[in-house]
């Protein structure tokens, strides 16, 4: 039996999961670790050295368990990057999208380009932390450093480079930069050059299932075995959507630190209505498009828990919020919730400023977050149906957030649609599917989705009005 290894690193945690593909998919978690933003040199950064060390730790644990995967691939969150100098050394820390360096930058870039033009060419949602604005901020604030940049690698590209010595920009993650043309599927040199970016620092765009080759000899010696590094959809949501068991007449909701809600489509939708609703057309497997909206997600409850000094588990916060009729809600996409000093106080201030009852008890704060998320999902569903001029029958929640039964039921109640929850490890599964397709163990995404449907439990939630 051949094993493959998915390295799935989210904005709050990472895991290494070994998968076997036979009549059913079997998963074994090998290693799990935390991922936290650190403050360094006055900026919010990712500790990429520590993350790479965790990847190597997971590989060593494979060997210790008597498991030697034949392949591996890495996925992470989107938009963040590492710039390398002429010696292939990082020029700066890996600054997080939550850093305020991009405050006001998006508006400055839009002044140079008509908003409609940027959207028509890239199809990407306008968010202040998109890569395009991070690069522009770096160029403006540290021009000397920016001029030295010879290679642009997104976070998973950088880890793949460290493992193999091969540089490439994987397609699904590259599209989130707002610098890839949605129709040519190549770097948009007109935009890149107009903003004063060096087009030569961007690498060849490669597709999921393409191989980067074997590990560098130093890592083979350290971890004790060799394997093939195969590109998955390196944007975690891109991998997660591959694992949606059924996509016909279904809206997917990838629920984690971020919530990404949308549909799979064969072409980009760059119409005015999609721009007005602020939807994005991110690249997917096989040049499919993930037409979706980014919503703040479970980051808010993660921060609430942290503000309570981790006295409550996530399950306890859910339990405390059950049976509470607290109805105050906040706009979860308000930038004030991106990186507040204290999430609980920010939620309370928002409620006070909007004339609503401010939550006080932990259960009330949690219920406010869950109700607010469900409300934002419901609005996004209505917008999707307006754009497509059709009703979708169901919503499939995937990722870690699908374990939140209270939130799943709130979504069903508010949208009046059937909600299906699972699989939980959708991202790792989608990552593995790309590897198995490259290795010839799975022929198509359609075959993979049937296999996923047969392999994992999916729970159904029905609106209370329809029970």
Curated annotation (Swiss-Prot):
Residues that hold substrate according to the record: 78, 235-237, 294
Disulphide-bonded residues: 351-368
Top EC class, one word: transferase
Reaction(s) the record says it catalyses: L-rhamnulose + ATP = L-rhamnulose 1-phosphate + ADP + H(+)
GO biological process: one example: glycerol metabolic process
Key words, A-Z: ATP-binding, Disulfide bond, Kinase, Magnesium, Nucleotide-binding, Rhamnose metabolism, Transferase
Required co-factors: Mg(2+)
InterPro entries assigned: ATPase_NBD, Carb_kinase_FGGY, FGGY_C, FGGY_N, Rhamnulokinase
Active site: 236 (proton acceptor)
Keyword Repeat: no
Residues annotated to bind ATP: 11-15, 257, 302, 400
Superkingdom per UniProt: Bacteria
UniProt KW Nucleotide-binding keyword: yes
NCBIfam families: rhamnulo_kin
HAMAP family, alphabetized: Rhamnulokinase
Recorded family membership: Belongs to the rhamnulokinase family.
Protein name as annotated: Rhamnulokinase
Organism: Halalkalibacterium halodurans (strain ATCC BAA-125 / DSM 18197 / FERM 7344 / JCM 9153 / C-125) (Bacillus halodurans)
């Amino acid at each position: 039996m051949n094993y493959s290894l998915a390295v799935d690193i989210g904005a709050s945690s990472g895991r290494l999961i070994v998968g076997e593909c036979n009549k059913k998919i079997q998963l074994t978690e090998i290693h799990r670790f935390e991922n936290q933003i650190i403050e360094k040199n006055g900026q919010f950064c990712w500790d990429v050295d520590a993350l790479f060390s965790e990847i190597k730790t997971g590989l060593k644990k494979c060997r210790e368990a008597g498991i030697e995967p034949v392949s591996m691939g890495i996925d992470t969150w989107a938009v963040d990057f590492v710039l390398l100098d002429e010696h292939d050394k990082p020029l700066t820390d890996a600054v997080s999208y939550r850093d305020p360096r991009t405050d006001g930058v998006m508006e400055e870039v839009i002044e140079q380009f008509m908003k409609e033009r940027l959207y028509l060419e890239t199809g990407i949602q306008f968010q202040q932390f998109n890569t395009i604005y991070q690069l522009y901020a770096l160029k403006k604030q540290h021009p000397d450093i920016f001029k030295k940049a010879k290679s642009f690698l997104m976070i998973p590209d950088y880890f793949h480079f460290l493992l193999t010595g091969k540089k490439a920009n994987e397609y699904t993650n590259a599209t989130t930069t707002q610098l890839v043309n949605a129709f040519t599927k190549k770097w948009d040199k007109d935009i890149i050059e107009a903003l004063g970016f060096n087009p030569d620092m961007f690498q060849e765009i490669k597709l999921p299932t393409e191989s980067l080759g074997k590990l560098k000899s130093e890592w083979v010696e350290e971890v004790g075995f060799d394997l093939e590094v195969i590109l998955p959809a390196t944007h975690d949501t891109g991998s997660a959507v591959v694992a949606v068991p059924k996509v016909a007449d279904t809206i997917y909701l990838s629920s984690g630190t971020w919530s990404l809600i949308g549909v799979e489509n064969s072409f980009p939708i760059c119409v005015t209505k999609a721009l007005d609703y602020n939807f994005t057309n991110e690249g997917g497997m096989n040049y499919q498009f993930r037409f979706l909206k980014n919503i703040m997600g479970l980051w808010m409850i993660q921060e609430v828990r942290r503000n309570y000094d981790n006295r409550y588990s996530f399950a306890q916060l859910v339990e405390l919020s059950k049976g509470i009729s607290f109805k105050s809600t906040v706009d979860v996409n308000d930038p004030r919730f991106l990186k507040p000093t204290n999430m609980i106080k920010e939620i309370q201030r928002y409620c006070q400023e909007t004339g609503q009852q401010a939550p006080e008890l932990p259960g009330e704060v949690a219920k406010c977050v869950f109700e607010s998320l469900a409300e934002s999902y419901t609005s996004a569903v209505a917008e999707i149906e307006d754009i497509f001029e059709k009703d979708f029958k169901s919503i499939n929640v995937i990722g870690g957030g699908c374990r939140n039964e209270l939130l799943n039921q709130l979504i069903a109640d508010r949208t009046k649609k059937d909600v299906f929850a699972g699989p939980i490890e959708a991202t790792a599964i989608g990552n593995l599917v790309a590897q198995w397709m490259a290795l010839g163990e799975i022929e198509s995404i359609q075959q993979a989705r049937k296999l996923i449907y047969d392999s994992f439990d999916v729970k159904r939630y029905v609106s209370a009005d329809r029970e």
